[in-house]
Design a protein with these regions (language model features):
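Conserved C-terminal helix/tail region of periplasmic/extracytoplasmic solute-binding proteins
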Residues: 348-433
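Extracytoplasmic/periplasmic substrate-binding proteins
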Residues: 235-312
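Helix-loop-helix "hinge/cap" segment bordering the ligand-binding cleft or interdomain interface
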Residues: 135, 148-246, 297-303
Length: 433
């Protein structure tokens, strides 16, 4: 009996063990996966940040900062934060030294503000592997002349997304359409009763601030001040004495936008009774500009592709239309902004007519200058031919004026002075690069 009870107990334990065996793991069905996906909260992708290195001394880059702020509010996938090398610096020279030291040490931001770099510095950064060659930029949609100084050895190393026009200009009735008349035409007396506001060395200084970059080749590290064109300019400047400005003088004034251009045309008309037109820097046309938004990508950044994408986004028409305090480079955006100025002109014109009790639709009283389609086309032609970056390199300007002074005072011939300019400028470019 005892043996029977023991056997029954063992049988019961065996059956219990069989019931407790682990069931095989079942793979989730597609329906189960969908259910889980709908019930679990989506993972949040952290916002990624790109750093933009710049030198902003005394808050001179407020327009650029405003553009970066607009970009950050545009819904772009990458936010841009500013690294100001001037923070804590006692002078601009200290800030430049700090930036150069950091870049050469490999401590680079994703993006670099290139608008302050001289042509020699820019070429040096490109040739020494600090700036990345840019591919896939929408060149066909942009003003081609603006990008010309951005190339080094045939490769694009930065983009200009916004700029200020930096023209020489004078009376339309004497100059014709913009860029029809050149600086040399005025200097040689081909335009009667029109002269420059400056004379002698001052005139040469103004000309070189606008046009000196045309005579510098950073690819070959050479200069061409001994060219016939520059020798003609140099000789003509020496013959122009400083005198009281004539009523029809050539003037200079940077213009940041179509709105500012229209405002200046109105002021010019109120003072002279006519419009102004832009003078070409040489017989081939062209005028000067100042970059406001000019950015490159640093080779040493781990986020190069994201930085390049940010630059492409800045060239898109939708972002370019948000630029208010500079000229955009996107042609479609430029045309649309000019059309807004045409409409604004019409609205102001109608207001003036109502206030003065007149009914003539075509008159604008003291508003005078009519910014219409023809005026917009003339301005667009100037912008299409803006291809010479203004020269802010004080060392280059000093070289030119030093040697020109020797010519003006009779110690050298024009050609001798130009030869020394070429040698000194080439040496400076080589050392700076």
């Amino acid at each position: 009996m005892k043996r029977y009870l023991i056997l029954m107990l063992l049988l019961g334990l065996l059956l219990t063990g069989c019931r407790k065996q682990t069931q095989p793991e079942q793979l989730p069905t597609a329906e189960t996966i969908d259910t889980q996906a709908n019930t679990e909260p989506a993972a949040q992708t952290p916002e990624q940040t790109l750093t933009l290195g710049m030198i902003d001394f005394d808050s001179e880059k407020s327009v650029l900062r405003s553009m970066i702020q607009s970009y950050n509010f545009s819904g772009a996938p990458f936010r841009i934060e500013i690294l100001n090398y001037a923070d804590g610096a006692e002078s601009r020279a200290d800030a430049v030294t700090r930036m150069t030291t950091e870049l050469l040490a490999g401590n680079v931001p994703e993006l670099l503000d290139c608008s302050d770099l001289s042509g020699a510095q820019y070429a040096g950064y490109a040739k020494n592997g600090i700036l990345l060659p840019l591919d896939g930029m929408p060149d066909a949609e942009l003003l081609s002349g603006i990008l010309k100084p951005c190339y080094v050895d045939g490769k694009l190393y930065s983009i200009v997304g916004a700029f200020a026009l930096d023209p020489l200009f004078g009376p339309a009735e004497k100059l014709g359409a913009s860029l029809e008349t050149s600086v040399e035409d005025v200097l040689c007396g081909a335009v009667p009763n029109v002269s420059f506001f400056w004379g002698g060395e001052d005139l040469l200084s103004v000309y070189c601030r606008h046009a000196a970059e045309q005579y510098l080749d950073y690819d070959t590290q050479t200069a061409s001040f001994e060219s016939e064109k520059f020798l003609n300019i140099l000789t003509a400047c020496a013959a122009v004495s400083s005198a009281a400005p004539a009523p029809d003088s050539i003037m200079q004034q940077p213009m940041r936008s179509a709105a500012m251009y229209r405002s200046m045309q109105i002021s010019w008309y109120q003072q002279t009774g006519g419009a102004f037109r832009v003078l070409a820097l040489d017989s081939d046309g062209g005028t000067a500009y100042q970059p406001v938004l000019q950015l490159g990508v640093c080779v040493g950044s781990a986020m190069r592709e994201a930085a390049e994408e940010a630059l492409r986004n800045m060239l898109r028409e939708d972002f370019q239309l948000t630029i208010a305090d500079a000229f955009p480079v996107n042609r479609a955006a430029l045309r649309e902004l000019m059309q807004k100025e045409i409409e604004a002109q019409k609205a102001e014109q109608q207001t003036a007519i109502r206030e003065e009790g007149r009914v003539e639709i075509g008159e604008a009283g003291d508003l005078a200058f009519l910014f219409d389609e023809a005026a917009a086309d003339d301005l667009m032609n100037v912008l299409e031919h803006a291809d010479c970056r203004s020269c802010g390199n004080q060392e280059i300007l000093k070289i030119i004026l030093d040697e020109a002074d020797a010519f003006f005072k009779g110690r050298k011939t024009a050609q001798e002075a130009a030869q020394v300019m070429d040698r000194r400028a080439a040496l400076f470019i080589a050392e700076a690069g």
